[in-house]
């Protein structure tokens, strides 16, 4: 293996490789930062360009776009509470709070640092333990997917702020919204009201933009917050070594969580981000800071979602199974280049594969370098008065929502959920649990029903499979431990 890695490293050392990594990363960051323009869109749009390229150059450019877009979503999530991608929704919780406090520069730097750490750890795991992780990933069936989704849903209690009941209500509403469209098992229309646009369900991007961006803009207009002071001025302070050190363990843990989840086909960066965020809050010594401007919260979210980038290649390269939409496109790109993903790929195209895997480490290094430079430009956004920014943000939101399906209906969905988000926020109901339930709802429902069909209606199937049982135990602990911790704190406060 070591000789293959060294050969891949030598093969990577080409000006052409680095130029296209640089260009791909720049394009990816721009796509990620613009609401509605996802990594999938970037990779799909530029894939035809790579057909005439050297396989290493073409695939590395597409991977650069993937990593860049995953990181880029955090920029607008932090600066204007408009996650560029669903994977950055958890980042907006603490990132925007820090921006309002005047620490947006620190938030952006933490997001960049955590994204780089997550991406590099994921790339290293791809390089060294891909076959082992692929074996674990293929053992996931419907019961395991249900248990994983259930574990993800328990995070609702962590992201509900001070009122868990309101968070659970929003989670229930999100689950209901996720049921709109054709039944995933029987194909029967549900909650469509005979409207043809609802048959396919609601797209995540318009819902995300509405709940976060539009609702926030309505709030600003209502309060007439049009001054620069509405988004507090960035202080010139930088992220300190002690702050990086304090969040480094969180980054490592979240990167591993993201890598494990990313290796499981059909999951994705959004799920990894929320699970990493919930776990970081659960073990934190200061959980009360989460939601009001915690650097640990940003570190967990960004390390988690970027930990997915390399991990999704594990089932793709070793088994020929794409982990998400981006790797499904990469599957086509590899096949057009004459490489058929699967167990024999390492024997037939070992040199090319190891060059790509080593190159993924350099992709993340380029992300850090380019991100460092771009942060200086992005912070200037907060200097622009909000009465100029609001029309620009609305235009970007409309463009992003429309771009999903080239349908005006998605723009209407965005506006509707903007109003929903504003009304619920007005009465103290957090919208993040609703978004999490919309993301995880389809996986939870479909996998649960498939499991019950397999077991002829017996719930024993969830308790007789080791991985499934482990996630169920984690779900119970995720709910029970915070309650026990709160009770202990209450008893201590009473004795004091």
Q: Where are each of the predicted segments found?
A:
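Membrane-interface alpha-helices at helix entry/exit sites of multi-pass transporters
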Residues: 56-60, 97-114, 285-297, 326-328, ...
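A structural-propensity feature for long, helix-poor, extended segments
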Residues: 66-77, 84, 294-319, 323, ...
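Membrane-embedded alpha-helical segments of transport systems
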Residues: 67-72, 113-125, 133, 177, ...
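Re-entrant/interfacial helical elements at transmembrane boundaries that shape
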Residues: 39-48, 62, 77-97, 128, ...
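Transmembrane alpha-helix interface/packing and boundary motifs in multi-pass membrane proteins
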Residues: 25-39, 68-81, 156-161, 255-265, ...
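Helix-loop-helix hairpins and the membrane-proximal interhelical loops
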Residues: 1-58, 138, 189-294, 379, ...
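Membrane-embedded alpha-helical modules
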Residues: 109-226, 336-489
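Short helix-coil transition sites and intra-membrane helix breaks within transmembrane domains
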Residues: 31-40, 78-88, 121-125, 261-271, ...
